[in-house]
UniProtKB/Swiss-Prot annotation:
<comment type="pathway">
    <text>Protein modification; protein lipoylation via endogenous pathway; protein N(6)-(lipoyl)lysine from octanoyl-[acyl-carrier-protein]: step 1/2.</text>
</comment>
<comment type="similarity">
    <text>Belongs to the LipB family.</text>
</comment>
<dbReference type="Pfam" id="PF21948">
    <property type="entry name" value="LplA-B_cat"/>
</dbReference>
<feature type="binding site">
    <location>
        <begin position="69"/>
        <end position="76"/>
    </location>
    <ligand>
        <name>substrate</name>
    </ligand>
</feature>
<feature type="domain" description="BPL/LPL catalytic">
    <location>
        <begin position="29"/>
        <end position="210"/>
    </location>
</feature>
<dbReference type="GO" id="GO:0033819">
    <property type="term" value="F:lipoyl(octanoyl) transferase activity"/>
</dbReference>
<feature type="active site" description="Acyl-thioester intermediate">
    <location>
        <position position="172"/>
    </location>
</feature>
<keyword id="KW-0808">Transferase</keyword>
<dbReference type="GO" id="GO:0005737">
    <property type="term" value="C:cytoplasm"/>
</dbReference>
<dbReference type="InterPro" id="IPR000544">
    <property type="entry name" value="Octanoyltransferase"/>
</dbReference>
<protein>
    <recommendedName>
        <fullName>Octanoyltransferase</fullName>
        <ecNumber>2.3.1.181</ecNumber>
    </recommendedName>
</protein>
<dbReference type="InterPro" id="IPR004143">
    <property type="entry name" value="BPL_LPL_catalytic"/>
</dbReference>
<keyword id="KW-0963">Cytoplasm</keyword>
<feature type="binding site">
    <location>
        <begin position="141"/>
        <end position="143"/>
    </location>
    <ligand>
        <name>substrate</name>
    </ligand>
</feature>
<feature type="binding site">
    <location>
        <begin position="154"/>
        <end position="156"/>
    </location>
    <ligand>
        <name>substrate</name>
    </ligand>
</feature>
<comment type="function">
    <text>Catalyzes the transfer of endogenously produced octanoic acid from octanoyl-acyl-carrier-protein onto the lipoyl domains of lipoate-dependent enzymes. Lipoyl-ACP can also act as a substrate although octanoyl-ACP is likely to be the physiological substrate.</text>
</comment>
<feature type="site" description="Lowers pKa of active site Cys">
    <location>
        <position position="138"/>
    </location>
</feature>
């Protein structure tokens, strides 16, 4: 099934949030699935069941946006890849848990492409460092919303960013959870390279393929809208 990839550059969170909901509400059975790849200015987002107490510093200077995804609080900022998955689960015959697992596998394979071992953790959505001095640190976050059988929101991967804003929150509701980025683990790939790798893996897994069958970049339908 075709997937349109939109490279949105640096875009304010509110604009993407409003656009995702509008896109999902306007979908028809023939609307192509889309992946939006974006980098946000600094912002905290709090899931619909999130506890505001997980924001530990009231005057951080970073705006807080309450959203309708699952999960607790997280941070988005420069140097982080955010990928929004606008997917018709019914058309692809996917259960929500299956979609989450495929997204997690795509992230794990992306990190492995840069010699970073990572894994999922039971009961804690996201991806975590598997070994070394930062074992257990969170390197990618995940949160979805399903409306009328279609997903929006998505995931974030920390590439090379200022990690200090994470110290002002309990990431995803876990007090004391370390958050790390790829650069701190020795990866030298830049944001754009990692984003291209991630998109290939995501599309492969949406189609139920293995990593070896990931689509070449020239096969992606792209738009800079």
């Amino acid at each position: 099934m075709p997937v349109t990839v939109r490279w949105l550059g640096e875009t304010p969170y509110d604009a993407c949030f409003d656009a995702m909901r509008a896109f999902t509400d306007a979908r028809t059975p023939d609307t192509d699935d889309e992946i939006w790849v974006v980098e946000h200015p600094p912002v905290y987002t709090l899931g619909q069941a999130g506890n505001p107490a997980h924001l530990l510093v009231a005057d951080s200077g970073v705006p807080l946006v309450k959203v309708d995804r699952g999960g607790q609080i997280t941070y988005h900022g420069p140097g982080q890849i955010v990928a929004y998955l606008l997917v018709d689960l019914r058309r692809r015959k996917l259960m929500v848990r299956t979609l989450v697992t495929r997204i997690e596998e795509a992230v794990i394979e992306t990190l492995a492409a840069y010699n970073l071992a990572s894994a999922r953790k039971a009961g804690a959505p996201g991806i975590y460092v598997e070994s070394g001095p930062h074992r257990g640190a969170k390197i990618a976050a995940l949160g979805l919303k399903i409306r009328n059988g279609c997903s929006y929101h998505g995931l974030s991967v920390n590439v090379k960013m200022d990690l200090r804003p994470f110290l002002a929150i309990n990431p995803c509701g876990y007090a004391g959870l370390e958050t790390i980025d790829m650069a701190s683990l020795g990866a030298t790939a830049d944001w754009h390279e990692v984003a291209q790798t991630l998109v290939r893996r995501l599309i492969a897994h949406l189609d139920g393929a293995t990593a070896a069958a990931a689509l070449p970049q020239q096969a992606l339908e792209q738009s800079n809208d």
